[in-house]
Amino acid sequence: MRRRGGDSFRRAGRRKISNVVWWVLSGIALLLFFLILSKAGHIEPRPSIPKRRYRNDKFVEGMNMTEEMLSPTSVARQVNDQIALAKAFVVIAKESKNLQFAWDLSAQIRNSQLLLSSAATRRSPLTVLESESTIRDMAVLLYQAQQLHYDSATMIMRLKASIQALEEQMSSVSEKSSKYGQIAAEEVPKSLYCLGVRLTTEWFQNLDLQRTLKERSRVDSKLTDNSLYHFCVFSDNIIATSVVVNSTALNSKAPEKVVFHLVTNEINYAAMKAWFAINMDNLRGVTVEVQKFEDFSWLNASYVPVLKQLQDSDTQSYYFSGHNDDGRTPIKFRNPKYLSMLNHLRFYIPEVFPALKKVVFLDDDVVVQKDLSSLFSIDLNKNVNGAVETCMETFHRYHKYLNYSHPLIRSHFDPDACGWAFGMNVFDLVEWRKRNVTGIYHYWQEKNVDRTLWKLGTLPPGLLTFYGLTEALEASWHILGLGYTNVDARVIEKGAVLHFNGNLKPWLKIGIEKYKPLWERYVDYTSPFMQQCNFH
């Protein structure tokens, strides 16, 4: 079948029109694409944000509030002075139980403070006009306070009364603290009492222990050998005495030449012997002798003034009655320990050790941390007592310990003479006997039977007895104060003998904690007796 020519012409025309349409559509699409791109690339400017104007921009150089308050002519100064006075009156009003008036004053104080605050905020001075009503209202209240006798004179009287009441209260608290501290210092710790009981039991049950100690003391010629280093301790405290002996032995360059003469009382005699018999092998060859003062037949009331005074009813009442003497005499002065023969035995050393020529006396509250053999070669220049002086401050001069209102003291002793300390003393017993030092002690002890020359302890009679007979030793030999005050660590490190004098003994709970390790390092906590009695 033949195709007609017209049909072929129409088909070619339709194809041409179709191509044109596609080209037109493509062009439109391209135009739209470029239009979109141009819109995306163009960033329209944002509307500008007006800059915020802060209040500080409006500030101008204005009033200095400090200068305004200090100016005597300013209104602010007047308002501030009223506030200060009103605050004082508020306190007095409250103490006087006038609570309504105190509230009125407080309210007006707040109003005045608001007035000052507004002036400081706007940085311009207060004017008379704006502050007149506030000042007037406060003045009315201050006038009322004066009418109520809240003026300066009354305030001063009230303050004086308050101060006096506080001082009395503080004095009462201080006195109670002193009493309780004294009681705590005098109390025997339960563990120490337990140790004494257990050691006493061990001594009487262990016959081998008794036999060993007797044999050793019978053949020991060291006890009277004056070429050796003789130390004496008078104590009823087993642990304290053991620390003195242990520390001396461990720090001695020649412990085999060290001899300790211990004197205790009847109650602790067996326990003291048991302790040193058990621990003798730990003392590096140190010789230890234990005695009790009850065995000294010469120690009786006919010879010893202190024992004679103990038979006096007034003395017994003073120390043992328990009456408080209306508080006139401090409790520490009435301590019966100051009549103990273990305290006064230091004045009888030549009688206790008749064969010895030189001894070093140690208190039981000391720790030895250096070799002490050099003490025995010190020249005392014909003096009897070698001691460390304590007169770096006026507190430790003679007038501190003695009653210089008494003519006998005033006529014989310089009040500014330098004091010294018991606790570590070198005694030349040859000179002692030659000068009859014990007789001098007896003289002054008998003169003080009514306690008018001195009140307390063994140091005052010691100062009188050894007056002019004492050679000053270098200070590092004897460091004092570890039982009541702070001591420089460098001084402690250089010290040969550390003394825990005072109430705060290292074996008590009230002892100064930072000094306890100096003492505890010489305590044998591994001992079964110590562990049984809960020593720690």
Curated annotation (Swiss-Prot):
Listed GO CC annotations: endosome; Golgi apparatus; Golgi cis cisterna; Golgi membrane; trans-Golgi network
Enzyme Commission code: 2.4.1.-
GO MF annotation terms: polygalacturonate 4-alpha-galacturonosyltransferase activity
Cytoplasmic side: 1-16
Protein's membrane topology: Single-pass type II membrane protein
Keywords (A to Z) from UniProt: Cell wall biogenesis/degradation, Glycoprotein, Glycosyltransferase, Golgi apparatus, Membrane, Signal-anchor, Transferase, Transmembrane, Transmembrane helix
Residue ranges, Lumenal side: 38-536
TM ranges: 17-37
Disruption outcome: No obvious phenotype. Reduced galacturonic acid content in cell wall.
Compartments, as annotated in UniProt: Golgi apparatus membrane
Superkingdom, natural source: Eukaryota
Family: Belongs to the glycosyltransferase 8 family.
Name of the protein this chain belongs to: Probable galacturonosyltransferase 10
